[in-house]
A protein has these predicted regions:
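Short, glycine/polar-rich helix-capping loops at beta-to-alpha or helix-loop-helix junctions
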Residues: 121-125
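Aromatic- and glycine-enriched glycan-recognition loops and surfaces
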Residues: 42-51
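Short active-site loop/helix that positions an aromatic residue
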Residues: 103-108
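Ser/Thr-centric signal marking residues that sit
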Residues: 115-116, 120
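Short, conserved active-site loop motifs that form the nucleotide-linked donor/cofactor pocket
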Residues: 93
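Surface-exposed amphipathic alpha-helical tracts and adjacent flexible/coil segments at the periphery
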Residues: 1-25, 29-39, 53-54, 60-88, ...
Length: 609
């Protein structure tokens, strides 16, 4: 018998609306921001909304994870503890956390997941976290397929969560301090200022210009939709879509796309099964290039990759549509590979490489009539970053999710019994006490029609069985009421039978992988100090946010500008024509020195005084 492993598609939710959309479009689990301390200051949610999402999702066995993944001040811990108890009582399935100080609090028996903000890159770190009580570990985005597989082999009992889609941080998560250093806004406190999306000049040690006014730290967006099966075989069990600040259209489209890809894999690979219930029926065709993206990359999944950055713009280009043939007074003609719609948003890169755009007023064959004529030249490539027709589809009901149920109507001594059994083997029965009377006309077709009317419920009839000894008559109103009571009872049983994992954190004292923590340990409060001391760490420096370290590395990047320019001594065997060190210079003339750590194959960014 094949041993089956449950695979979780984990979707983001900015708010309740996005969370419900994620359920409807195929998510097995959803992560959503806590009322406070959720690593996205702009994406907090009320306890009431979270409780409503829990109630909706659990019908489909969809799990709800709440992010509490920031580092915390001492004076915030008491409120955080209370909030966690409130989330537990609301039925939340797990918390995604960063601050080890939380493990020293009086927490309810709720599972904890180790956020990628903990910088989870090694099997030693993953094993430590699992032994400390973490039930799932979110791996660093920079890991290769081989590295993920090695971690899985070393820690086969630890569920591994990997990002498969969405925006990429150029620095290792949890190891970026540049926003705090430059703007007083800590990424580890949920207030990232998006420094990596800014434009920079790059100069050498002599002040010679290497590159001017480019977004040199801005990466493309992650897209590993073609590598899902390889990720599963490597040991990933939770596949995560980034996007807790994205709108509902993005959540619908991207979740549905990955749902379809995974379901196709599951049909062939019986050792993998989905982690929730209900079949998703879509009213649109999911297409990733219809949603926000800076272009796509599979990042470092197969080691270093030259096609990971988006130097021209940090904004969404969208889908390539064709090229400009000629420009006339109030329109331009296009040699198109796809058709445009009235109201579409179109963008292009001008002669200087800057992103420009316009809105289409109307389309006539291959003629585009912009609302305002852009300054554009023939042979310019056009992209559509807003598809009016697609967004119209996304703005209305675009999917439904139905749990299969078998309905059986049988007679009994007092009347009739309607039994309902769903795809997860939950079963209920309701009784109609009524003296039997024979019908004058055949009833079976009508009975099947009436019992199958499950439209505005989470259920869909996969089979309807009529087990009668005679052609009995039941008024349509009574049959409808019997069906309604049966559905309500089945819903109640599904909620009762849902198993919220109860897990009490163990008190542990096993050794942390290192015995000294610099500011990179992100230790912000006394409880975090206590945790690390209890696990063998002897020297503990405070978090950068608490005491900025001198000469601190502000960013640790797998993305390397020397490699991107074609001057990597390991890969290209070419000597740079410019003298190091190189510097990034921002528009307000701040300078940042680049250091290339070839031993660890990474680039470090320092602020110059």
């Amino acid at each position: 018998m094949i041993r089956q492993r449950k695979i979780e598609l984990l979707a983001p939710a900015k708010n309740l609306e996005c969370g419900i959309a994620a359920v409807d479009h195929g998510a097995d689990a959803i992560y959503i921001g806590a009322p406070r301390f959720g690593a996205r200051a702009a994406a907090g949610n009320s306890l009431e909304d979270i409780a409503e999402l829990v109630r909706y999702a659990h019908v489909y066995n969809v799990r709800i994870y709440v992010t509490v993944n920031t580092i915390l001040k001492d004076e915030e811990l008491k409120d955080t503890e209370k909030m966690i108890w409130d989330l537990y009582r609301a039925g939340v399935d797990a918390l995604i956390v960063q601050d080890m100080g939380l493990l020293e609090l009086n927490l309810p028996p709720i599972p904890l997941h180790a956020s990628t903000q903990m910088d989870n890159r090694t099997s030693q770190k993953v094993r430590f976290l699992a032994e400390a009580g973490f039930r799932q570990v979110v791996l660093a985005r920079e890991l290769s397929l081989v590295e993920i597989e090695n971690i899985h082999h070393a820690c086969p009992d630890v569920p591994l969560e990997v990002f498969v889609h969405g925006a990429l941080c150029v620095s290792y998560s949890g190891q970026c301090y540049v926003s705090q250093a430059c703007f007083g806004r800590s990424a580890n406190r949920g207030e990232c200022a998006q420094f990596c999306r800014l434009a920079f000049d790059m100069v050498d040690a002599d002040g010679k210009s290497i590159v001017r006014n480019k977004h040199l730290l801005s990466l493309k967006d992650l897209n590993q939709s073609e590598e899902l099966e390889q990720l599963l075989d490597a040991g990933a069990s939770s596949l995560k879509i980034e996007g807790r600040l994205k709108d509902v259209s993005y959540v619908k489209n991207v979740t549905a796309y990955y749902r379809q890809k995974l379901d196709t894999i599951f049909k062939r690979r019986k050792e993998y099964i989905r982690a929730s219930s209900g079949e998703v029926k879509l009213e649109f065709k999911p297409q990733l290039d219809k949603s926000f993206s800076r272009g796509f990359t599979n990042y470092f999944l197969f080691d270093r990759n030259k096609d990971i950055f988006s130097f021209d713009t940090p904004k969404s280009l969208g889908e390539e549509m064709g090229t400009v043939k000629e420009i006339r007074g109030n329109y331009l003609t296009v040699a198109g590979i796809k058709s445009f719609n009235n109201g579409d948003g179109v963008c292009f890169l001008d002669e200087t490489g800057k992103l420009q755009g316009f809105r289409i007023n109307r389309v006539e064959n291959n003629k585009l009539f912009p609302q305002e004529m852009p300054r554009i030249k023939p042979r310019t490539i056009l992209y559509r970053n807003f598809d009016q027709e697609f967004e119209r589809l996304m703005s209305r009901k675009s999917a439904e999710r139905k749990i299969a149920v078998i309905l059986k109507l049988a007679e009994n001594n007092r009347g009739f019994t309607l039994s309902l059994t769903d795809e997860d083997d939950n079963s209920v029965s309701v009784v109609l006490e009524r003296e039997k009377e024979r019908a004058r006309t055949p009833q079976e077709d009508n009975l099947r029609t009436q019992l199958g009317k499950l439209g505005n419920t989470p259920f869909e009839a996969s089979d309807i069985v009529i087990d009668w000894s005679d052609n009995w008559f039941i008024p349509a109103s009574m049959l409808a009421e019997l069906r309604r009571k049966g559905i309500e009872k089945l819903l109640e049983v599904r909620r009762i039978n849902y198993r919220q994992e109860i897990y009490k954190l163990p008190r542990t004292h096993h050794a942390f992988p290192v015995n000294e923590l610099t500011y990179l340990g992100n230790v912000m409060n006394a409880d975090a100090v206590s945790f690390y001391r209890n696990h063998g760490v002897q020297r503990i420096a405070p978090a950068y946010e608490k005491a900025p370290a001198e000469e601190a590395v502000l960013m640790f990047c797998k993305h390397c500008l020397r490699y991107s320019m074609g001057w990597c001594p390991s890969w290209h065997k070419v000597r740079s024509p410019y003298r190091e060190p190189y510097y990034l210079v921002s528009s307000d003339n701040r300078r940042f020195r680049l250091e290339f750590d070839c031993k660890n194959c990474q680039m470090k960014v320092y602020a110059e005084k």
